[in-house]
């Protein structure tokens, strides 16, 4: 339709926006859905969407005039309109939190929400009135912003926003730490430990609650700590001593580790970052742990912080039994892909007897009770007399059979179905016990063939941070 020259990139755009919208339909987006605090989730998702939107726009500009209307309808509009929905809701969430914190930058995000709202209107009007000379006038009339129930709103409605009046008396520095919705201007705090096996950067915000710019310095007391300043319009290079800045709104301090500066044989090192500005001082402890994974088998996931997150397709063993075989479903699920047994009409199987299974290996730094969260597709039972079950076992324990969607769901339990539809996922928790520190084996058995596995998250010490997509995948040996 649009020529071989553009086929590969158009396919990338279409795969991207259908995958991203599969996580959560745009009409079911709200400001609270994605976390703007934990796991850098909202910013990561928006950056992914921005990348494919920019690609879609680049293609549009290069297409011949006679192809632009069809491309706008089939590719550019659904991609960019979805991106604008994500941007509007994420910026709304930031505006509300930052206003609560007294941050001057709340006003910038209010402006960005207004801009996204106007852009959405302009795109819909172009679709209705200009594209193909108005052939599809009215197609994009349905309101999609301000939804409060199952019926669509009559008109698009702007979300409620907050504006901040800066405090008088000059600049007033604050610091916002990763994975926290609090801001501080004094005291000593600690970042999550860095590990040499992950490409890790932690980001700290230095911001302002006052009516004039904040001048600040960030000083590292150890040469292995690298820091850089990131602003809305440019990013400095990493340095290993002192970084300086001035901001009326927010600057971001990225922190990472220069592993070449850690002495050989050291398993753990510590240092401090000191942030000074407007007469305030905040000290942040930095810890770096060195892991030796050279002797671990291939595809072993490594525990570095009490949480092990595993994408379904990164198994160690895929064992076919009873006529069933686990296969990858690309681009389906919260993040990477999913695994499902085929053929779908396969009869119920018994774990440990004739059930095909996936096996995963992981290390754990602690023993005792732990929780496994299994992310699966919100598939309903495939027949009236069956549920939708899978089975799970860790190490030598007896397999637990887990019901994801009962065939006899009680009247009044519609929220189970509703939640699955809204989230395009069900998350099931099972309890297990790790008796020793070693490489552990986790098996997921098919019971009902409709079960589709998206990801696994092991929580060893109740340290999972709340987010929509769940923790990013942990390091595993290659």
Q: Where is each model-derived feature located?
A:
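Extracytoplasmic
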Residues: 197-478
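Catalytic domains of carbohydrate-active enzymes that cleave complex glycans
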Residues: 1-209, 308-329, 339-348, 356-364, ...
């Amino acid at each position: 339709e649009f020529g071989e020259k553009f086929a590969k990139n158009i396919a990338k755009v279409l795969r991207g926006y259908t995958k991203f919208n599969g996580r959560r339909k745009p009409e079911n987006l709200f400001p609270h859905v994605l976390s703007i605090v934990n796991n850098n989730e909202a910013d990561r998702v928006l950056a992914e969407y921005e990348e494919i939107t920019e690609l879609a726009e680049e293609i549009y500009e290069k297409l011949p005039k006679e192809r632009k209307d069809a491309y706008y309808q089939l590719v550019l509009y659904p991609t960019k309109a979805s991106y604008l929905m994500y941007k509007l809701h994420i910026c709304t969430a930031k505006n509300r939190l930052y206003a609560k914190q007294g941050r001057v930058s709340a006003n910038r995000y209010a402006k960005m929400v207004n801009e996204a709202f106007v852009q959405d209107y302009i795109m819909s009007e172009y679709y209705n009135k200009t594209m193909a000379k108005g052939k599809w006038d009215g197609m994009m009339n349905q309101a999609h912003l301000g939804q409060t129930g199952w019926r669509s709103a009559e008109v698009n409605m702007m979300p409620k926003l907050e504006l901040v009046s800066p405090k008088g008396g000059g600049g007033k520095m604050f610091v916002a730490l990763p994975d926290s919705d609090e801001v501080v201007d004094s005291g000593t705090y600690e970042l999550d430990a860095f590990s040499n096996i992950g490409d890790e950067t932690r980001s700290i915000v230095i911001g302002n609650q006052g009516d004039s710019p904040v001048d600040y310095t960030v000083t590292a007391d150890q040469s292995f700590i690298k820091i850089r300043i990131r602003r809305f319009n440019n990013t400095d290079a990493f340095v290993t001593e002192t970084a300086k800045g001035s901001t009326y709104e927010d600057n971001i301090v990225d922190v990472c580790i220069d592993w070449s500066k850690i002495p050989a044989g050291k398993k753990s090192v510590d240092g401090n970052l000191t942030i000074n500005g407007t007469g305030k001082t905040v000290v942040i402890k930095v810890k770096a742990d060195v892991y030796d994974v050279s002797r671990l088998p291939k595809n072993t996931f490594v525990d570095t912080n009490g949480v092990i997150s595993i994408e379904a397709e990164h198994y160690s063993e895929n064992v076919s039994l009873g006529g069933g075989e686990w296969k990858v479903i690309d681009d389906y699920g919260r993040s990477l892909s999913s695994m499902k047994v085929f053929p779908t009409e396969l009869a119920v199987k018994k774990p440990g007897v004739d059930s095909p299974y996936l096996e995963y290996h992981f290390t754990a730094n602690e023993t005792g009770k732990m929780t496994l969260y299994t992310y699966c597709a919100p598939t309903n039972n495939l027949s009236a007399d069956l549920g939708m079950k899978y089975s799970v076992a860790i190490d030598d324990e007896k397999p637990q059979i887990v019901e994801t969607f009962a065939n006899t769901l009680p009247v009044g339990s519609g929220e189970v179905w509703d939640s699955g539809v809204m989230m395009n996922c069900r998350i099931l928790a099972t309890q297990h016990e790790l008796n020793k520190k070693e490489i552990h084996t986790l098996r997921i058995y098919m019971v009902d063939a409709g079960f589709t596995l998206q990801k696994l998250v092991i929580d060893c010490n109740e340290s999972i941070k709340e987010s929509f997509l769940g923790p990013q995948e942990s390091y595993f040996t290659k």
